[in-house]
Design a protein with these regions (language model features):
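C-terminal catalytic domain of photolyase/cryptochrome flavoproteins
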Residues: 1-147
Length: 147
């Protein structure tokens, strides 16, 4: 969702985990985690909105962001990045039956809403919004930009 280079994520896993074996790690990272193989390993991207994270974990307790909002000052960065991912990859995801509902929901957004999501996602990537505000996504993760 953040738009980092999947190959750099793969290289990072190999570098930091002593027990990482490339023949296992590569398909898991590029295929399942990053969906960089276009759906060979996984049938849909492993992405989630802030609402899903809130429902499934305690990580949102005390957070100032609202997982129900996709844009605006109070929008959860995960919600923003989720919708931005769908916007950026709408054409490719439209061919995936498991993503049909999400793609239809993207199509329902007004142009102004789409623009607001894209602008906020860009601000998140620049490090202007989020838990590491002031640190770009590249600096925070160590991974370069990708589509």
């Amino acid at each position: 969702m953040l738009g980092v280079d999947p190959k750099q994520v793969h290289a990072w896993y190999l570098a930091v985990y002593v027990d990482a074996v490339e023949w296992v790690e590569l398909p898991n990272t590029l295929g399942m985690s990053q969906y960089a193989d276009g759906g060979v390993m996984g049938s849909k991207p492993c992405i989630a909105t802030g609402k899903y994270i809130q429902r499934m974990s305690p990580h949102c307790r005390g957070c100032r962001y609202d997982p129900a909002q996709r844009s605006g000052d109070n929008a959860c960065p995960f919600a923003t990045l989720y919708w931005d991912f769908l916007l950026r990859h709408e054409a490719a995801l439209a061919r995936n039956p498991r993503m049909a509902l999400q793609v239809k929901n993207v199509a329902r957004l007004a142009d102004g809403q789409k623009r607001a999501v894209s602008e906020r996602a860009a601000a998140i990537r620049r490090g202007e919004i989020g838990t590491d505000a002031g640190v770009s996504a590249e600096a925070a993760t160590g991974f370069g930009r990708h589509a």
